[in-house]
Swiss-Prot record:
GO molecular function, one term: histone binding
Keyword Signal appears in the UniProt entry: no
Residues recorded with modification N-acetylalanine: A2
GO cellular component: CAF-1 complex; chromosome, telomeric region; ESC/E(Z) complex; nucleus; NuRD complex
Chief place where the protein resides: nucleus
Gene: rbbp4-a
Family: Belongs to the WD repeat RBAP46/RBAP48/MSI1 family.
Listed Pfam families: CAF1C_H4-bd, WD40
Descriptive protein name: Histone-binding protein RBBP4-A
Subunit details: Binds directly to histone H4, probably via helix 1 of the histone fold, a region that is not accessible when histone H4 is in chromatin. Probably forms a large corepressor complex that contains ncor1, sin3a, hdac1-A and/or hdac1-B, hdac2, rbbp4-A and/or rbbp4-B and possibly rbbp7.
SUPFAM superfamilies xrefs: WD40 repeat-like (SSF50978)
SMART domains per the UniProt record, alphabetical: WD40 (SM00320)
Taxonomic superkingdom: Eukaryota
């Protein structure tokens, strides 16, 4: 009986999701300046824009690259680098041109060939997360279903994977007992990599000190303050010795690598009422960070007074798994998760007055809801070179590259507000 009910619930949910998607699609020309939808061969659990951009002469597009991974059933997995063509601002755009088969608009010339897989490197098991080293973007670290963290220099691998299916990372980083997701390169100390694991620990490696012949590197330090699965870890963006971690023990911890005590953080906060899944430091304001949780909220913190939560962002209907500050705007951050939505928030709008109708759509700081995914969003990344462009990937193989309409974030004209999800009120 329960099985029948579950099947019925699933069917109803699927119908609702399809209905919502149709409404979203109908409204895309009003809500976006760009939407590209691409079905990957396998879902990617990870997405990160690389820092480089190519602007070919005489073309109305620029070429950007993404680090992705695969999560296959039983087939060979790969670390993937893809290229994406994005239209220049002056490209002739016709938002009414929406190819419903391809699911793309904001097209320029032909809409084909905008997203191409350039490099595939054989990987052991799915790629839980992949992040490039800021000082040398050819170096990419990955989290695997085993306890090892792998490091690849993609310039030392052929762009087509070895048919033998052998995974040959340039380094294997040892120290964990279990898998995990959190991974962070130090932006100020080249080669310093942090990793968070289900084994309740955080490992730190320094790969810049590795002898040329050694392929296996042991952790330099292991931090053991959390009492449950550590979900995410992130270096502070300005202070080379500070980092933050969040875990299923509902805590946010701030650590200093100069301290000799690896089992006690310099600060520990009961951050949420459920597991804390992600954190992000603000790139413009050295004291500000955000955490995202299974309690469906994003919390805002000030390192100078962690006892007091600055704000709680509430609109998600399920667990939040990723939070990222915009690289271009100090007050903008985005969050995503199980509810298939990516919310963009604007701190500067906290506390603004709202009409009762507007309040029904969400709090004033909720700038935009990206409703284009029909499955859980695994990861997303702000494009570092094109303001307001985001790439998001979901569990149903879909990757979307999109940019909200300029009139949404340039709100000189505040008359006639748009429901952020374009679903009417």
């Amino acid at each position: 009986m329960a099985d029948k009910e579950a099947a019925f619930d699933d069917a109803v949910e699927e119908r609702v999701i399809n209905e919502e998607y149709k409404i979203w699609k109908k409204n895309t020309p009003f809500l976006y300046d760009l939407v590209m939808t691409h079905a990957l061969e396998w879902p990617s659990l990870t997405a990160q824009w690389l820092s480089d951009v190519t602007r070919p002469d005489g073309k109305d597009f620029s070429i950007h690259r993404l680090v992705l991974g695969t999560h296959t059933s039983d087939e060979q997995n790969h670390l993937v680098i893809a290229s994406v063509q994005l239209p220049n601002d002056d490209a002739q755009f016709d938002a009414s041109h929406y190819d419903s088969e391809k699911g793309e608009f904001g097209g320029f010339g032909s809409v084909s060939g905008k997203i191409e897989i350039e490099i595939k490197i054989t990987h052991d098991g799915e790629v839980n997360r992949a992040r490039y080293m800021p000082q040398n973007p050819c170096i990419i670290a990955t989290k695997t279903p085993t306890s090892d963290v792998l490091v690849f220099d993609y310039t030392k691998h052929p762009s087509k994977p070895d048919p033998s299916g052998e995974c040959n990372p340039n380094l294997r980083l040892r120290g964990h007992q279990k898998e995990g997701y959190g991974l962070s390169w130090n932006p100020n100390l080249s080669g310093n990599l942090l990793s968070a694991s289900d084994d309740h620990t955080i490992c730190l490696w320094d790969i810049s000190a590795v002898p040329k012949e050694g392929k296996v590197v042991d952790a330099k330090t292991i931090f053991t303050g959390h009492t449950a699965v550590v979900e995410d870890v992130s270096w502070h963006l300005l202070h080379e010795s500070l980092f933050g971690s969040v875990a299923d023990d509902q805590k946010l911890m701030i650590w200093d690598t100069r301290s000799n005590n690896t089992s006690k953080p310099s600060h520990s906060v009961d951050a949420h009422t459920a597991e804390v899944n992600c954190l992000s430091f603000n790139p413009y304001s050295e004291f500000i960070l955000a955490t995202g949780s299974a309690d469906k909220t994003v919390a805002l913190w000030d390192l100078r007074n962690l006892k007091l939560k600055l704000h709680s962002f509430e609109s998600h209907k399920d667990e939040i798994f990723q939070v990222q500050w915009s690289p271009h705007n100090e007050t903008i951050l985005a969050s995503s998760g199980t509810d298939r939505r990516l919310n963009v928030w604007d701190l500067s709008k906290i506390g603004e007055e709202q009409s009762p109708e507007d309040a029904e759509d969400g709090p004033p700081e909720l700038l935009f809801i990206h409703g284009g995914h029909t499955a859980k969003i695994s990861d997303f990344s702000w494009n570092p070179n094109e303001p307001w462009v985001i790439c998001s990937v979901s569990e149903d193989n879909i990757m979307q590259v999109w940019q909200m309409a300029e009139n949404i974030y340039n709100d000189e004209d505040t008359e006639g507000g748009v429901d952020p999800e374009g679903q009417g009120s």
